[in-house]
Amino acid sequence: MKVKFYGVRGSLPTCGPEYQRYGGNTTCLLITREKANRVAIIDAGTGIRKLGKELLTDQFKQEIINILFTHFHADHIQGFPFFAPAYNKQQKIGILVMGKERKMKNIKEIFATQMQSEYFPVQLDSMGAQFDFLSFGDTQTFYGARVTAIAQQHIFPGGSYGLRIEDESGVIVICTDIEHINGVDENIIKFAENADLLIHDGQYTETEYLKYKGWGHSTCNQAIEVAKRANVKKLIITHHDPDHDDDFLENMEEKCKKEFPNCTFAKEGMEVVVR
């Protein structure tokens, strides 16, 4: 499997010369299973705009494009109206969520609301693509890859779910928008156990977290603790705070490497292969 990061920022997109090395687009990842010639998108932050253009090329052409959502906060869906394949009448697109305990509104309604005429010139039903809005339980197999979901500590309606993706090449665990309340969540440690790659929220410093407790995010130290205790091979910290510019993130990354050497911070365009 291969992961490519198209958006690594949390809360809202950022721009400016001081955000070029790590990137300013909000969360969007592409998972590629080369053996099955299949791709899956995780979340639709503003990074999905660039990805959408790439998916129009013959290299990436897919009969069905599946977008699997961890949750539906604005920074994880705000790029969807600018996703070029959604305007192709021949394109089939699956809008997918997992988690048997998830309590939330109708999925289609969430996307239709953000594209109402008061907010956007094109409404969901006028985009053109053939959409399927699908909900699954905690475990599902997609094109030979087993995907497991876990409810994370995220107090907002609909919650947020971590994802564990497994195939013959290895294991990728994605835990964005997770808050470890009263200590690191033991369920998440077990969920991430022995993963080849852990992608974990690290929006705040320890000092910042005191101010933003209850906002649904983690510190870098918490991400490192999960990685160590779960015995993961590689840790990528993502969901960077919009106030953290390149120099700030680079400094944080160096500190994190001292605690967990095989740790890096997500950057737009970064590709990681799991074998």
Description of each model-found segment:
Residues 72-74, 120, 152, 178, ...:
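Long, contiguous hydrophobic alpha-helical segments, chiefly transmembrane helices and signal peptides
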Residues 1-172, 189, 250-274:
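Binuclear metal-dependent hydrolase catalytic cores
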Residues 171, 179-268:
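Cap/insert and terminal regions of metallo-dependent hydrolase folds
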